[in-house]
Amino acid sequence: MEVAAAVGVIASVPILYKAIRPRIKTSVECWFCRKSTKVEYQQRNSFTCPSCEQYNGFTEDGDYNRRIPGQAWTTPKRYCEPGKMQSEKPSTFLDRFGGVNMSPKASNGLCSECNLGQEIIMNKVAEFEPIDEDRWNEELEDYRYKLERMYQLCPRCTIQVHGKLEEDKKKYSYLLKVKYKLKHAIGSTLREVMNNQKRSRRFFFAGGSTCEALHFGCLISSIILFLANIDFLQQDAGASLINLPKALQDILPEVYKYSFVINFLIFTTHLIAAFNNKCRVTLPDLLLPILLILAMLTVLTSSDNLSQDVALVRGACASFSTILSMAVTLLPRKKLHKKRPNKIVSSAFSVASTPISQCSSQNSRNASLLDHDHTILRRSPHTPSASPPAMNSSPPLLREITNGPVWSAMRSRENKENMQSYQTKPNNHVESMDWDDSESMAAQSVAQSTRSSHFKPGLLSRNINERMTAQQLTPSVANLNLDTRSVDSPSIFSRQHRQMAQQQNHTPTRSLFGPPRSMVASQYDRSHYMAPEAHTRPGSVFTSVSQQDGHSTVSGAWQCRVIGILFALVFIVLIMQIGLFYVLFTRN
């Protein structure tokens, strides 16, 4: 009985389903607009979408499953249907615009003629076939341009189109602002990053191939030693925090036994890499050896009572050493400063760059000129009627300057005037000395003392009793005479002294090349009777460097503070790691 009831129920289920299912609507999706709608169950493969009014009914081949009358309709389909007629009363500017086609507008804002022209353009573009397939885009653009020129919009529709474009531009202008803001933000960020990179000048793996290979070896060794300490602590505590591979678990106990040797190798390798490094030393480079020494000391400590604490300290040192090794290997560094020799000529703080050195160089140059003149005057030091020296006897430093025709003429005229003044001077005026002329001789002695120095006399010293122009008062390097030597003339030089002073007063013109060579004889003879003077060396010229001592002291104090704070943070982190390992792996 029960079996018959079960068979009857099973047989009645399909019958009930076929009877009830057609009465329930099913949900379908339009193939064109992708919108869902509910239709009768029998029409699930042949329905018209209420949204897009398209027929949905297809065969297995993808064709329609019935004949569609619209496919055989020859009337061209209009993409823009004309709307309702507006009132005859002009309400807008476009309606009051005269002299244009006032045809009724469609729903898109264009008149019927312009809509027809746009439809023709679309059809012709769809039927376009290029002559050359390689120039398909160029030919299409030319063809479209010709069609738009042929079917132009009327003035009314042209204004309507421009108004619509301006309205859309105002409506969506915020999108352009957002675009420009994003572009500016991204560009400024990239520029800042590039500028910071150029300013910092930090480079990855710039220490050299040998140094980077040693750093990488230190990193690998530190990681292996850290895993060995973790495995030892796990086995000692009976916990399993990290599941390591079986092969690695077999090797790590052997590595832990030789932890002292591995730490020593890491320490030695790090020192060798530091000496061969082409970059600057950083803080991890200084902290890593300290931690390695501490780890080696924990290995040397052997006490049963402190075995657990020593293991925790050893694990903390291994973990922190791994972190520092990663920082040493992977962080960018600045390169070392280029070593440049401190040459006297090129150094900014050398003696050659000071005014004293410039004057001393001018002093030596003038002394060489006077020595050259002395060698010429040794031939006839007391013959005023001697012929003037030739131009080729001038020193080499002035030969290039005085080889021009203008300077040669000036020098020859000066020599002639000097020789005439020697020949026309009376002898009694030279032999006797009148003591009433003491005041004039005092001024002449000042000029003579200026002339007796090793510097080439300046314009002010050579024309002290003459009227000078503004061009002659222009300062020169020769006037920077720091060796202020004033020696009184002895009595034995009274004849030469009066002779040079009187000749200076009677000489009408002066040259920029110093006194005439006939006047240098007294200076040469005077050098035999003058006692050599001790030249005092100038003070230190490195004053600009010493002035920075205060700033360097302040910056050094700040550096000491920063280093102290960093060391304190390192030890605080180390103590926290020791406490963490102690809490995790301490036995109850």
UniProtKB/Swiss-Prot annotation:
UniProt KW keywords: Membrane, Nucleus, Transmembrane, Transmembrane helix
Family: Belongs to the TMEM201 family.
Low complexity: compositionally biased ranges: 384-396
GO terms for cellular component: nuclear envelope; nuclear inner membrane; nuclear membrane
Annotated gene: samp-1
Null allele phenotype: Nuclear migration defects in hyp7 hypodermal precursor cells.
Name of protein: Transmembrane protein 201 homolog
Perinuclear space side: 234-254, 302-309, 586-588
Phylogenetic placement of the source organism: Eukaryota, Metazoa, Ecdysozoa, Nematoda, Chromadorea
Transmembrane segments: 213-233, 255-275, 281-301, 310-330, 565-585
Region (Disordered): 378-457
Membrane topology: Multi-pass membrane protein
MF term (GO), any: lamin binding
Taxonomy, superkingdom: Eukaryota
Main function: Plays a role in nuclear migration in hypodermal cells.
Nuclear side: 1-212, 276-280, 331-564
Subcellular localization, as worded in the UniProt entry: Nucleus inner membrane
A single BP term in Gene Ontology: embryo development ending in birth or egg hatching
InterPro entries referenced in this protein's UniProt entry, alphabetically: Ima1_N (IPR018617), TMEM201 (IPR040041)
Biased amino acid composition, Polar residues: 418-430, 441-452
